[in-house]
């Protein structure tokens, strides 16, 4: 099992993004640091424009640019710093992935262009202005 740590500064960014998008979904890309056996810390994320009440579409061009900038800022140390996956909000719904979420993440992890050993999906919403979320891991063999 993977452990994903989300530092306070990243949590604050997430809360601000969720407050700004209101009842519309928002999301982006997660980048992080390998800090121990099966343990990763989110060290950077993108916040892309909000979507609709029930969906969010990630802009691929902005995502690739953010990942490249992240790699450059970490001296391309792919062993320690890398793309972790995606995050988005479910402001009006459960923080559990929809069937569309599962499908999208399985496509990502099995895409040879992505080249990931795993991808993580974090889903958040605000409950009484506090961050509530879930984490899901997807592997290239199709398992979660």
Provide a role label for each language-model segment:
Residues 1-83, 91-144:
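Conserved beta-strand-loop surface patch within small alpha/beta domains used
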């Amino acid at each position: 099992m993977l452990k994903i740590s989300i530092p306070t500064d990243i949590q604050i960014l997430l809360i601000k993004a969720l407050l700004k998008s209101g009842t519309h979904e928002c999301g982006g890309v997660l980048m992080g640091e390998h800090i121990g056996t099966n343990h990763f810390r989110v060290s950077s994320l993108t916040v892309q424009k909000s979507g609709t009440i029930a969906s969010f579409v990630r802009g691929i061009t902005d995502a690739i640019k953010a990942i490249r900038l992240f790699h450059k800022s970490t001296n391309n140390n792919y062993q320690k710093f890398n793309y972790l996956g995606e995050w988005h909000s479910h402001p009006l719904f459960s923080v559990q992935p929809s069937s569309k979420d599962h499908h999208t993440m399985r496509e990502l992890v099995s895409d040879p262009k992505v080249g990931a050993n795993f991808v993580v999906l974090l889903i958040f919403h605000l409950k009484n202005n506090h961050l509530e979320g879930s984490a899901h891991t997807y592997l290239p063999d199709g398992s979660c």
